[in-house]
UniProtKB/Swiss-Prot annotation:
Domain HTH deoR-type: from-to ranges: 8-63
Pfam families, alphabetized: HTH_DeoR (PF08220)
DNA-binding region ranges: 25-44
Keywords, alphabetical: DNA-binding, Repressor, Transcription, Transcription regulation
Record has Cell wall biogenesis/degradation as a keyword: no
Source organism: Bacillus subtilis (strain 168)
PROSITE patterns assigned: HTH_DEOR_2
Induction: By disulfide stress.
Protein name in the entry: Uncharacterized HTH-type transcriptional regulator YtzE
Organism ancestry: Bacteria, Bacillati, Bacillota, Bacilli, Bacillales
Recorded name of the encoding gene: ytzE
MF annotations from Gene Ontology: DNA binding; DNA-binding transcription factor activity
Length: 73
């Protein structure tokens, strides 16, 4: 796996775990927490949403779904 792909997957996993820990979060909170651009956060959230791991109950807010996930390192 390419280093850039590995870095992206690690970041997406971190974003998911942050949302799971905090409950409902805003896109801006994620930008502030991870120090990356809003567009990058949006891409990461789209990957998570596509896999039914997060959803947006209202514009700019995100929470995890009830789907069970096994997190590995």
């Amino acid at each position: 796996m390419k280093p850039s792909t590995n870095r992206m997957l690690t970041r997406i996993k971190s974003v998911y775990m942050f949302i799971q820990e905090k409950g409902l979060v805003t896109t801006q909170e994620l930008v502030d927490e991870f120090g990356i651009t809003p567009r990058t956060i949006q891409r990461d959230l789209n990957v998570l949403a596509y896999n039914d791991l997060v959803h947006s109950p209202s514009r700019g807010k995100w929470e995890t779904t009830r789907k069970k996930v096994k997190i590995t390192s």
